[in-house]
């Protein structure tokens, strides 16, 4: 696969091809007509990273084409990048080129932006960072008005903070999310907001309680929690759990219990398996679970989690891999059918498609 071309004139054509493939692949599973949620055709990506190419005193941003991975493709800009990233790229390059402490052995640059306009830049080096780097970096951060981090092997220098704060309006609420450097956050902010709206619409009227697996930094948790009595949310990443606690407090969400456990562990606990230390103080018998929400990694749900899912009347499933979503739905066909479906174009001009389904229990 080659590097994507970012041509707005081709946007609808490339999206139509992905939707057609989704509908064809899922037709044997009785897929209803999916809602389609489009991305902005340009400046949609809130995360980006680039290698830095040094040549005769000049620095350039570089990407690598999977079709020719050893040859760098030098770029002046990145049309997919969100506006704060696109505006910062040329300024950063010129300022770093003019500063020997910032330029020397700079290997990679990583950007993390928000819909609300914040920007964090991580500069990654192949050398230890010393006092001269920090002094130059503080000048750069102040001049550009960004959060700046320096990293090298076994070293990380955070000038102010290693996170940005996302804020946006959703169904009459202003939501706030801490997004930590190096932790997962949704790359396409506009499409993410559409996913939250769709998920809330499917969850309305569910009542009872919610079990959420793979909750990350609480992206969906914060949006969905007001629609349920109580929520039990699980996540394995320590940094994501910290961010989730921050985000729940920042949004005044007080009906969520977070536990750092893998999906197979919570499946075992709910099935009456062994006692887990991290579940101490949590009264599982006090929950009336009616809905399961999952947003798993590309590998999808394991067998234990599929077995757990069978016990729920409603399963809300967001997937970044249609193939494993297909396999999981096929495994649940004896108990659940697809009541609603959606396609989210998180990654325009690529073959990737984010999908959402609501599965409703059809048999005891």
From Swiss-Prot:
Catalyzed reaction equations: uridine(54) in tRNA + S-adenosyl-L-methionine = 5-methyluridine(54) in tRNA + S-adenosyl-L-homocysteine + H(+); uridine(341) in tmRNA + S-adenosyl-L-methionine = 5-methyluridine(341) in tmRNA + S-adenosyl-L-homocysteine + H(+)
Domain of life: Bacteria
HAMAP family: RNA_methyltr_TrmA
A GO CC term assigned to this protein in UniProt: cytosol
Class of the enzyme per the UniProt entry, highest EC level: transferase
GO molecular function, one term: tRNA binding
Gene from which this protein is expressed: trmA
Protein name stated in the entry: tRNA/tmRNA (uracil-C(5))-methyltransferase
Pfam hit, one: tRNA_U5-meth_tr
Keyword Transcription regulation: no
Alphabetical list of PANTHER family matching this protein: TRNA/TMRNA (URACIL-C(5))-METHYLTRANSFERASE (PTHR47790), TRNA_TMRNA (URACIL-C(5))-METHYLTRANSFERASE (PTHR47790:SF2)
UniProt-listed SUPFAM superfamilies: S-adenosyl-L-methionine-dependent methyltransferases
CDD domains from the UniProt entry: AdoMet_MTases (cd02440)
Active site per the UniProt annotation: 320, 354
InterPro entries, A to Z: MeTrfase_TrmA_AS, MeTrfase_TrmA_CS, SAM-dependent_MTases_sf, TrmA_MeTrfase, U5_MeTrfase_fam
Binding-site positions, S-adenosyl-L-methionine: 186, 214, 219, 235, 295
Keyword Endoplasmic reticulum: no
